[in-house]
Amino acid sequence: NVTVTANYTAKSGSGNKTNKSTGSGNSTNSNSNRRPNSTTTGNVSGGRTTVVIDKNGLSNTSVVSATVNGSSDNFVIKITESASASEEVVKALMAEYGNDISAIKYFPMDISLYDSTGNNKITDTTGLSISITLPIPDSLITYAGNNKVAGVVNSKLDKLTPKFSTISGVSCICL
């Protein structure tokens, strides 16, 4: 029962209502595997998506790619560590598996979409879909394809069905 977490905001329906999703996973790694502010650029139809990673425990960032479908604009996807994402993940894991989650390895991260400047968070994602490939977090590599991936929606796990692949010898999660 390993969970890798992603965090994104998606607008649903009409009006200003948004649904916030947070993925989960666990990292007890030291800072030696940190790639602060590492940047990878992926292609988008008619535009470019830049992925900025500022999170401990994600090595091999050269395999990161992302595509934003539904727009020809340029975007920045930021993968960061945030206390709020971590708290939401813990709450959702406890709701799903009980109060003792000490046996579960998880890796919480905040994955958010920004405009091309990287300063303005995109909250209305109507018509957009995002495909992203990330290396399996360092602390979860040994579990390979047995890893589970989820977001958090309304304080509950939203279990996702990723594909696992190997790119240049690096185990990856594709969503």
Please annotate each region the language model reported.
Residues 127, 165-170:
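Short, solvent-exposed loop/turn segments in extracellular or other extracytoplasmic domains
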Residues 120-121, 155-163:
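Surface-exposed loop/edge segments in extracytoplasmic proteins
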Residues 4, 171-173:
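Short strand-edge motifs at loop-to-beta-strand transitions and within beta-strands
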Residues 1-13:
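Conserved "repeat-terminator" motif of extracellular CCP/Sushi domains
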Residues 8, 134-136, 166, 175:
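Hydrophobic residues in beta-strands and at strand termini
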Residues 10-146:
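Feature for mature exported/ectodomain regions
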Residues 42, 161-166:
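Short, exposed beta-strand/loop patches in secreted or surface proteins that constitute
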Residues 1, 143-144, 148, 152-155:
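Surface-exposed interfaces of beta-sheet-rich extracellular modules
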